[in-house]
Amino acid sequence: WLMKATTVTVAFGIVVILGTVVGFGLTGGMSNGSELTATWTSDTGRQVSANHHAVAVADGSVYAPISDDRDGSCALISMGVADGETRWTYDIPPENCTIHAVADPTVADIDGDGRAEVLAATTEKEVAVFDAPSGDIETRLELSDYGYTQPIVADFAPATGREIIAVDVTGTVFVFGSDGETLWTARLDEYVWAQPAVEDFDGDDNPELLVGGRSGDAVLFGPDGRVEWNTTVSEMGSITWGTYGQADEDPALEGIFATTSGSVVGVDGRSGAVEWRTTVGEFAAVRAFGDGDGDGAPEVYVSAQDGRVHALDAATGEIEWTTEVVVDRVQMMPPPNLGDLDGDGSTELLAAGNDGSVTVLDPATGDILSSYARDVQIFTHATIADSDDDRADEAYVIYADGRVVRLEYERPN
């Protein structure tokens, strides 16, 4: 079942490049002929407008966390990437059906048998592990509260095989073995809304777990649960989004955090020292990290409640450009994504707006290339993946009403 696709253009935007302001108006289509169009819209609509957990895309399927309001229609739904048709559904019990019923899912082969699993934290206070093709439950991993963030599958702890790492909403860290055994836990005693990450942050050839919390503190855990550092990232706002990458020439990675007060903060992965701090506006959000302009130095791409998207130098936090993609007053803005949307070997920036718009930008300049919209809010970032092996990434966006839209971008040669 498909809804009619709509392609729109942005009525007005402002680009600020190194202090220069450029205004432009767009009417009746993009002058470059590029188009962002919907190939399907899923039949997973709900009566509430509060869905805000992103989908996962892997192996020909989209896994959509669908929330509602205690009417029994909360679910994790598997659908085909080609047509959005439902393949299987896991229903959350009505008493657990809330706007946080199912958090962002993860797809991974946990046990190495060549068959993927889907993992999702739920309001049943567990991480549910499903056989990806069939939707059958393989195991349930108990949490102390519901999970808000995406489970991580990584070779992390000093144990055989890969581990499952989950941080529930009240800040308890769980590390499970691939057999479901709890290896260790730790309590942060604060809410965690930003996505945790496992990587070798300090450059010692061993992975660590980085977690940011409501208090504005970030904590780096070693694989045995030992705290390696604890840093105050913000005294004025909660950490709600984060990303990471190699921003400079030292071996350690940098953690990049965005806060409700509007700060974007770069933190050294070895020591936890704050390397830079930039203010972009309230409810800052960050996810994309990469060399979007091809100059050999990475950028981080940030949004804020005022509807603007910013490119920041990842090493210094200096703002390289700013573009307004949403003109109307909105509640928040999801963070933008990087991906090769047209298959030409270079990346584009995709910004989902809380007003229901999805905008493609040139990551080097901030120029708006194309846009799509539904008259429904968006509360989370898109998921970008080349799901049909055509060398071009597709974007999957979940709207607040629970419908998932697959978007494709075409740009003339």
Question: Which residues are covered by each model-predicted region?
Answer:
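Hydrophobic alpha-helical segments
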Residues: 1-413
